[in-house]
Amino acid sequence: MTSIAFDLPADILAIGDAMQAFVKREVLPRHAQHAALLDDPRRRYAPDGRYSNEVYALIREVRMASAKAGFFNMCVPASIGGGGLGHLAYFVAWQSVYHTCGAHHFLAPYAIGHWAFAASAVLEHVTDAVRKRILPELLSGRQSMCFGLSEPGAGSDASMIKTRATQEGDGWRLSGRKLWTSNSPHADYCIVFAVSDAHAAAAHKGGISAFLVPTDAAGFELESVVKLFGHAGGDEGALVLDNVRVEREQLVGTLHQGFATALLGVSLGRVYNTARAIGLGRFAIELALSYVQQREAFGHPLADYQGITFPLAESATQLHAAHLMGLNAALLLDRGERAIKELSMAKSYAVEVGLEAVNRAMQAHGGMGLTNEVGLAEIWQILRIINIADGTNEILRRTIVQRLLKGDTDL
């Protein structure tokens, strides 16, 4: 039974079903076979904090299996070898992946090419020579990349970046630091954003450029792995660029207009995190609904107690609203609208209600909700992270009110 009155295109619905089948065929069996490794944060990581070789081999296997099945690059522009599907397909596919994986979600992010880790519209703006060199490996899932924008002093306000691109002959030298660069501990390439015109950057009139840098380039260093929630490792890195040489062909997009390049990925990133929050929130509520019907206390199943079930009903209502908001934003984007307000609303609302849904599911489980075996605690951590990643809720509300004050008040 569907809870949505309007019909989605048949091919979009088929993508959701196909992704669910792929996850059940390729992702969940791998997780089950290696659960002792993947479910234990103490065993996932090598001594330097990166994923162990065993774990990274599984990640690469999933990427390559997805590429072979035709899913990994389905939303990559056709001009660079992808399927050319849009934001709605991206939203439906990712929600299906996370809803299906649920607590066994560790390999889920690699079932589809993430815009910052794999081929994306950003690579439409590199030279033909660079495309020919890097695209085959990225499209196949054998290699990956990362997105170096945030810095120690530049997070929500990316205009504060200090990394410099100093002209040298026909190329540049990059020097600076990056922080919170997801996938950087294992990436083969990094899109590095740097100040190329200090006066223009200071006046907020451009002056920032993007460059594609191999992570094995001289002077490019992963200084450390950023560790979160007490884990022994992580997937975010602190990077140092010390006089890294880049040639003109490594420029991504237009010189001094790097933020235009960055914005190519922002919409997809927010669609992704909206879908991820809804998928994981739905999984958590469904898990809690099953549990409260089985668990008894004081002679009755927990489902008989409104104090336990009403919060689940409220979260289901919120997730339904978030789902509709996400679909609407994706449809607007596919129609050619910028949907700045609508996507900001969808992402900020979805990650908040997704987090609260997991919190309520944990409470319904009592002590069991905190255990590694149930898996809700780690889902909570993921959703707590994406209340900050790809635009904090506060920044998104700032964006929403700016649009409203400019007259974009259609709701």
Regions found by a protein language model. Give the residues of each.
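A short, Trp-centered hydrophobic/proline-enriched beta-strand micro-motif
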Residues: G141-L149, F193
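A short core secondary-structure module
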Residues: S175-E223
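Flexible, glycine-rich active-site loops centered on histidine and acidic residues
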Residues: A118-H125, H199-A200
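Long, acidic (Asp/Glu-rich), low-complexity accessory segments flanking structured domains
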Residues: N243-T261
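Short Gly/Pro-enriched turn/cap motifs at secondary-structure boundaries
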Residues: G153-S156, W180-N183, A201-A202, L228-D235
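Alpha-helical interface subdomain recognition
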Residues: M1-H104, Y110-G113, H125-V130, E137, ...
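Short beta-strand-to-turn element immediately C-terminal to the catalytic PLP-Schiff-base lysine
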Residues: E124-V126, T166, V192-S196, L212-P214, ...
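Flexible, small-/acidic-enriched active-site or ligand-binding loops
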Residues: M160, D216-E247
